Amino acid sequence: MALSVASPAHAGVTRGDIEALAQAKSYLSFKAFSFKGLVGQLDSPYGGQFSVAEATYAAQHCGANWNAQAVRAAKEYLSISSFSLNGLISQLDSAYGDKFTVAQATYGARKAYK
């Protein structure tokens, strides 16, 4: 059953929230994202152009496992370039990179390095 804006079980959920959630799931189907990275992509003028509130709603409700996303991102990096373990962690948690938390970046890099 599709989520309806008028549904009493989802009071306060806007059409923008629903559309942002659909786009978040689409993005996650082909690329790894951190929570902050996904919000940034969704609210970017070059991405989804959703409001920060809509983008945040989508990231909170998309069902992503952020540790698993960090592993996926780490493996993506290792498939195209060489990194030290610490360099990979830095790339994953960088404000200019993937924006994972330090814990998520460390988890992802260590799992990908195995």
Regions found by a protein language model. Give the residues of each.
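C-terminal segment of classical bacterial N-terminal signal peptides
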Residues: 1-9
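An alpha-helical, amphipathic repeat domain used for nucleic-acid recognition
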Residues: 8-114
